[in-house]
Curated annotation (Swiss-Prot):
Protein name: Aldo-keto reductase family 1 member A1
Gene Ontology terms describing biological process: aldehyde catabolic process; cellular detoxification of aldehyde; lipid metabolic process
Residues under site feature: Lowers pKa of active site Tyr: 82
GO MF annotation list: alcohol dehydrogenase (NADP+) activity; S-nitrosoglutathione reductase (NADPH) activity
A Pfam family per the record: Aldo_ket_red
Amino acid sequence: MATAVEYETLYTGQKIPLIGLGTWKSAPGQVKDAVKYALGVGYRHIDCAFVYGNETEVGEAIKESVGSDKGLSREEVFVTSKLWNNKHHPDDVECALRKTLQDLQLDYLDLYLMHWPYAFKRGDQIFPQNPDGSVQYDLTDYKDTWKAMEKLVKQGLTKAIGLSNFNKRQIDDIISIATVKPAVLQVECHPYLAQNELIAYCHAHGLVFTGYSPLGSPDRSWRKPEDPVLLEEPGIIAMAKKYGKSEAQILLRWQVQRKVVSIPKSVTPTRILQNFQVFDFSLSEEEMQLIGALNKNWRYIIPLITVNGKSVPRDAGHPLYPFNDPY
């Protein structure tokens, strides 16, 4: 039943599967079965984060699926997690990773990402708030956070470190002070947000590029009726019919051929399996260009909060907000 998987290689020599299982928005009670099923059908890459609130269940699934007596070794599974914004202070970074390792029941991660470039107020509140509903920030410099993350590699707690939701200027900042280079950049990426410049930049600087929400996050709670729907694009539907594949498989194949790692989220077995079955066909160069031409720099994932009764972008006012730059 298992499908062969293709990989990209990090500068560390690690191999990261081009398709992984995303776990954002996967509810406790569902995510354990989803991870177990995914590992059973051949997934070898699980993408996690502390803020998703489900790492304990993900850990149970890994424990029940991986081990010398289960035919799947720990070394065969690539596990990513992410440092949340309230733990950016250098003194908090190691504790944050150790908490994730405890929840996942692992001795080490394959990759640990800084989830966002800006810090929230130190403490145990995941979303510390001001009285008006806005977020309480902290001015910890991400370069100082990075230096603390480098120590985690030297301690053997993670094999590689990387960045999420950083722009080019911010990645340059990190590279300028790094003694352990970032191995991966993870950002939103799909045909409406093709990220061509950022992908080219990453590949030129030795970073593997991972795209989250590769299907356009159709299950996002803040969806508006007027938002464009990627899975309903006529050209994508036509290609799906031509190849006898789902629209999701066409979108994921496009990323595979661009050497972009994708982490589609699902808790539905049929979709988990479908999302993985993208290595047995290829899109033509013309089809790749047609999909690429859908780019409109449309960002689905902009966290929103309610401030004084109005819905506003959560972090757009922060000086380190990454999405004001062109890329």
